[in-house]
Amino acid sequence: MSMGSRYAVKLTTDFDNPKWIARHKHMFNFLDINSNGQINLNEMVHKASNIICKKLGATEEQTKRHQKCVEDFFGGAGLEYDKDTTWPEYIEGWKRLAKTELERHSKNQVTLIRLWGDALFDIIDKDRNGSVSLDEWIQYTHCAGIQQSRGQCEATFAHCDLDGDGKLDVDEMTRQHLGFWYSVDPTCEGLYGGAVPY
């Protein structure tokens, strides 16, 4: 299955970049639901399925599809069920995931983040028009707890609306998240409107 992306992204990694490290440290702490300095796949799935999907009103089928994508994505970074992962293990797992995902993207192959994006868009695209509006984006980010202010949501939306049509498609979101989380693409700086560093 080919991604067929319309958008180029920086394909080289910069794992020593303080911005890349700060972004992932922020998310590690955000995802550490019980604040014990360790995370596991149980916590990811609980947050994704029992909190976010439930708040968004996802169907059982949508929740199962989304959960599989979360399992595959975070599994790609080395997370497992019932096995705690520390920060050093987490960041090393992200290095492996980033390399693998960028390699897939460079070959026009489907990435785990794209599969997750497809599953997520199916849930948040409430009017079923194949794109996400600003209001749909705001609802999702509030349910996920990533962004709380409208300004942060609007900043991310504008940053991801690469074709300037006032709506987001999954290709735009995938491209920006590849650049932000994997390669520190300078065109992706400020992606989360300040909710996530840099």
From Swiss-Prot:
Domain of life: Eukaryota
A GO MF label: calcium ion binding
Residues reported in the UniProt entry to bind Ca(2+) 1: D32, N34, N36, Q38, E43
CDD domains: EFh
Coiled-coil residues: none
Residue numbers covered by the propeptide annotation in the UniProt entry: 1-8
Ranges of residues in domain EF-hand: 19-54, 118-147, 148-183
InterPro entries registered for this protein in UniProt: EF-hand-dom_pair, EF_Hand_1_Ca_BS, EF_hand_dom
Residues that coordinate or bind Ca(2+) 2: D125, D127, N129, S131, E136
Keyword list, A-Z: Calcium, Luminescence, Metal-binding, Photoprotein, Repeat
Record-level GO BP terms: bioluminescence
Residues the entry annotates as binding Ca(2+) 3: D161, D163, D165, K167, E172
Function statement: Ca(2+)-dependent bioluminescence photoprotein. Displays an emission peak at 470 nm (blue light). Trace amounts of calcium ion trigger the intramolecular oxidation of the chromophore, coelenterazine into coelenteramide and CO(2) with the concomitant emission of light.
Name of the featured protein: Mitrocomin
Taxonomic placement: Eukaryota, Metazoa, Cnidaria, Hydrozoa, Hydroidolina
Gene name in the database record: MI17
